[in-house]
């Protein structure tokens, strides 16, 4: 995590503020979505997915794997990918803070850093808190979307 943070912060230093803001928001949204996927995989009803698989719904078989392996899926999506997204968003925020400070040298760095940390926390934690009820309510649909994505990737990258 430390080396990833250092590497990404170095990369982020070379990106303009106009590009780093959308990239920052993309990383935050990706973290929120992966957290929702982890929650949905633990909540999804195996019977509903099994019913879709018996009707040959594309991606349902793959979705079944995600539901049956929910503890591992949740661990990867919530913990691993979520932590990586948090680290990346923090690194991007620090890079943006220093860029803003270079544009406005009279602004207090402590104030600017506190504001940056607050924004990162509010967007990340708040976004996850707001998205979790949706993920719980639409667990089967979310897992099916994940299964369809897995199905498509498998078809595109299968060996011939």
Where are the model-predicted features located?
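Membrane-embedded alpha-helical segments of inner-membrane proteins
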Residues: 1-160
């Amino acid at each position: 995590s430390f080396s990833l943070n250092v590497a990404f912060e170095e990369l982020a230093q070379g990106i303009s503020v106009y590009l780093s803001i959308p990239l920052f928001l993309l990383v935050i949204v990706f973290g929120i979505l992966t957290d929702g996927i982890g929650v949905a995989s633990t909540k999804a009803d195996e019977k509903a997915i099994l019913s879709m698989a018996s009707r040959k719904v594309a991606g349902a078989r793959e979705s079944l794997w995600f539901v049956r392996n929910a503890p591992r899926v949740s661990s990867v999506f919530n913990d691993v990918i979520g932590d990586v997204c948090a680290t990346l968003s923090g690194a991007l925020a620090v890079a943006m803070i220093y860029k803003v400070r270079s544009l406005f040298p009279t602004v207090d760095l402590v104030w600017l850093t506190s504001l940056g940390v607050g924004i990162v926390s509010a967007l990340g934690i708040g976004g996850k808190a707001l998205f979790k009820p949706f993920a719980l309510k639409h667990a089967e649909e979310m897992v099916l979307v994940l299964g369809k994505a897995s199905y498509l990737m498998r078809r595109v990258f299968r060996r011939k």
